[in-house]
Amino acid sequence: MTDAASAPALPDGQALAALVAGKLCHDFISPAGAIGSGLDLLRDPTAQDMRDDAMGLIEASARKMIALVAFARVAFGASTSAERFSGSELGALVAGLTDGGRASLDWRVADESFSRAEARALVNLAYLAMAALPSGGAAVADARRESDALVIEGRAEGPRARLKPEAAAGLSGRPLAEGLPGQWIQPYWLWLTVTDAGGTLEVEAEDGRVSFLARMPN
């Protein structure tokens, strides 16, 4: 029998900040490293025949980095800010992450105004729907206003659509018992965003399909 005192606890404060920072560093290091590699090629006198390739690498990686930073500003920024976002603006942020990816995203969110917390939930849910399609497929993100709540839905359909155990734990608000923290923190962050706003988050996973349903009070 497991001792309750030794069971993993949910992170807060510095521990939560460290996990988010680690996630962001992991996301940023690939395009940042590619930019550095391109600059090295430009400086190499023996590789001048590769200048066009180097510039292409730098440009593509810079666009990826800009897209990641813009997304992270909304996905992980302070939810207490008075700033609001339009549906089209949020769709563009998520679309910036799909370039060159295997999964497609159908953004069916109306071009209305969303609070910071609602925007955070929307973009994270859409991102996780695409992340559930490691071998490609189609993801859908939808949102609608009901009398008492904003309802956000996400669906992922593909040949290997699935949730990793770490993601399943995070999406249900459970601590990470084992596995990779980087696979857990963003799903947990979505759960935390929704529940801190007084809402609920439901997730269903079956063969070839994963669905998300969040409700946040208006």
Enumerate the predicted regions with their spans.
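Glycine-rich ATP-binding loops of the HATPase_c
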Residues: 198-205
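Cytosolic coiled-coil signaling helices that couple upstream sensory modules
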Residues: 1-10
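Conserved catalytic segment of histidine kinase HATPase_c domains, centered on the N-box/ATP-lid region
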Residues: 42-54
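Short C-terminal beta-strand
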Residues: 209-217
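Conserved ATP-binding N-box helix of the HATPase_c
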Residues: 18-38, 43-45, 117-145, 186-196
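Conserved DHp (HisKA) dimerization/phosphotransfer helix of two-component histidine kinases, i.e.
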Residues: 51-104
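Glycine-rich/acidic phosphate-handling loop/turn and adjacent ATP-lid/helix
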Residues: 148-187
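Conserved short strand/loop->alpha-helix "switch" segment adjacent to the catalytic nucleotide/phosphoryl-transfer site
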Residues: 9-19, 102-130, 134, 177-182
